[in-house]
Amino acid sequence: MEEVTVYKISDRAKLPYKQTSYSAGYDLYSAYDYVIEPMNKELIKTDIILKIPNGYYGRIAPRSGLAYNYFIDVGAGVIDSDYRGNVGVLLFNFGSTQFNVCKGDRIAQIIFEKIAYPKIIEVTTLEEINITDRGNSGFGSTGLK
């Protein structure tokens, strides 16, 4: 990927920014002030529109400091290459106190990832998907420690 084009909808918008040369994610910033009550959610607008190259998408991920210190998490975090709207970040407050988001705060990070577009083929028998030794064992089946 060579470049992602960014359009700022308002003067409140900030360009995504990589804090270090080898950071995987680019910080995203709130364009407005918000209050997120405990055990609630808010859609935080960034006031940016992205043009992500075909073959890539943007994955919205939490900022570790917000998650660790304030119990703030991110949901619904996929920005497709053909999306051309205001990038919003769904923040969940799993903490016991309200969380204030101020204009200009770093709220999440976007990681640009390569994507595959496989053809989906329906089969009519279970044998056609090659059953493995693991089978349908999931959620802790390979050990908890």
UniProtKB/Swiss-Prot annotation:
<dbReference type="InterPro" id="IPR008181">
    <property type="entry name" value="dUTPase"/>
</dbReference>
<keyword id="KW-0378">Hydrolase</keyword>
<dbReference type="InterPro" id="IPR029054">
    <property type="entry name" value="dUTPase-like"/>
</dbReference>
<dbReference type="GO" id="GO:0046081">
    <property type="term" value="P:dUTP catabolic process"/>
</dbReference>
<protein>
    <recommendedName>
        <fullName>Deoxyuridine 5'-triphosphate nucleotidohydrolase</fullName>
        <ecNumber>3.6.1.23</ecNumber>
    </recommendedName>
</protein>
<comment type="similarity">
    <text>Belongs to the dUTPase family.</text>
</comment>
<dbReference type="InterPro" id="IPR036157">
    <property type="entry name" value="dUTPase-like_sf"/>
</dbReference>
<keyword id="KW-0460">Magnesium</keyword>
<dbReference type="Pfam" id="PF00692">
    <property type="entry name" value="dUTPase"/>
</dbReference>
<dbReference type="GO" id="GO:0004170">
    <property type="term" value="F:dUTP diphosphatase activity"/>
</dbReference>
<keyword id="KW-0546">Nucleotide metabolism</keyword>
<comment type="function">
    <text>This enzyme is involved in nucleotide metabolism: it produces dUMP, the immediate precursor of thymidine nucleotides and it decreases the intracellular concentration of dUTP so that uracil cannot be incorporated into DNA.</text>
</comment>
<dbReference type="GO" id="GO:0000287">
    <property type="term" value="F:magnesium ion binding"/>
</dbReference>
<dbReference type="InterPro" id="IPR033704">
    <property type="entry name" value="dUTPase_trimeric"/>
</dbReference>
<dbReference type="GO" id="GO:0006226">
    <property type="term" value="P:dUMP biosynthetic process"/>
</dbReference>
<keyword id="KW-0479">Metal-binding</keyword>
